[in-house]
Amino acid sequence: MSALLSESDLNDFISPALACVKPTQVSGGKKDNVNMNGEYEVSTEPDQLEKVSITLSDCLACSGCITSSEEILLSSQSHSVFLKNWGKLSQQQDKFLVVSVSPQCRLSLAQYYGLTLEAADLCLMNFFQKHFQCKYMVGTEMGRIISISKTVEKIIAHKKQKENTGADRKPLLSAVCPGFLIYTEKTKPQLVPMLLNVKSPQQITGSLIRATFESLAIARESFYHLSLMPCFDKKLEASRPESLDDGIDCVITPREIVTMLQELNLDFKSFLTEDTSLYGRLSPPGWDPRVHWASNLGGTCGGYAYQYVTAVQRLHPGSQMIVLEGRNSDIVEYRLLHDDRIIAAASELSGFRNIQNLVRKLTSGSGSERKRNITALRKRRTGPKANSREMAAATAATADPYHSDYIEVNACPGACMNGGGLLNGEQNSLKRKQLVQTLNKRHGEELAMVDPLTLGPKLEEAAARPLSLEYVFAPVKQAVEKDLVSVGSTW
């Protein structure tokens, strides 16, 4: 090896630039309002936003934020690669196909093709069974249940430790959104210690599938696992070094499903069937279709924040949960009150602009602990039977995610139901938002709901082998502190 070439030269990380590498010309739009603290003011919801050509995936998955080697990984996770690889593997008698699909993808396909969720599920199962000889097809709820259960367990333990030691009260941050995880590791490594180390439903589902087959003496090489996910960053998640043992071979999105059908000259609706026995016949041994095809309360991204507060509420009979909306629709706080005290709080926060403010709050020191106005809450409390929204209105308070115990962060505005890989082709921002609202409504109406807090420990205990539940974070040291407001102003 040449003396001029060292091991350190092999790191091909491309440091993010202050200016976006994919700029756009904006004319006639309103300027962003930045207050005296350097925070974006997003207190109002515009009636209609201008059409834009830069998406979140441009920001989080371009060469400004990922390495060139990761770009290769993205290209290796596509429907074309799946068709090529499975075309070869399917010729081997000892190989079989397993498909896992997230609830967001199922709802997106149902909405796109104008079908009920059940009809779309059966159509998708029938398509993969008949065209690719798929042996098993599962929903990702079992993986999500375990992910939620471990998350809640860790938040509660962390909070007890902080109360006993008087440690810093900054919130824990979720790591289940790969877009936010990548962004944090490579631009804000000082936030990495705040990340709660629990894998996403995608990866835990893969680990569960592998454990199931190992218990049946089926070698890892005998099956090919295709995962259908709502965003392209899920491809990078499956390619993380610690994720390779989870047994996911390829990740594609609903957009790629539609493209694949077009390339195969197939009509999705031609696979319509009323054979509901597919739910059971395509479930692996020990997998209850009433569970893995279900969902849970708390939101379409998993409901981690809601489920944590619910878990604490069960430990404190008589406590009341209130739901507080933030400055914009992408911020929500679940606050638990008991004897006029806030005993637990968790928030949902989505979108790059809200993430900018979150990072600024948590890194500038302005996110230090402050006393909440409990007196105001005490005076304005309604009766114990008031529902969450009535209580939120009565307190006249605004969500304060920066002082929560835990923040469920999602990179996409509108969260996972607005993932870049979904079939939400509306360019008009208002119509796109309306589509997300429609999908969220369908999620609550068409999916059966299960209790992850009860089922989580049981599923983990029933697993045939210990599951891989944690990431190995890889923060990148930054030579120069990035000015997030400057970055945002180029959008």
UniProtKB/Swiss-Prot annotation:
[4Fe-4S] cluster 1 binds at residues 20, 59, 62, 65. [4Fe-4S] cluster 2 binds at residues 177, 231, 412, 416. One of its GO terms (molecular function) is iron-sulfur cluster binding. It is found in: Cytoplasm; Nucleus. Changing residue 416 to A: Reduced iron content and strongly impaired maturation of cytosolic Fe/S proteins. The keyword Nucleus applies. This is Cytosolic Fe-S cluster assembly factor NAR1. It comes from Saccharomyces cerevisiae (strain ATCC 204508 / S288c) (Baker's yeast). The lineage of its organism: Eukaryota, Fungi, Dikarya, Ascomycota, Saccharomycotina. The gene is NAR1.
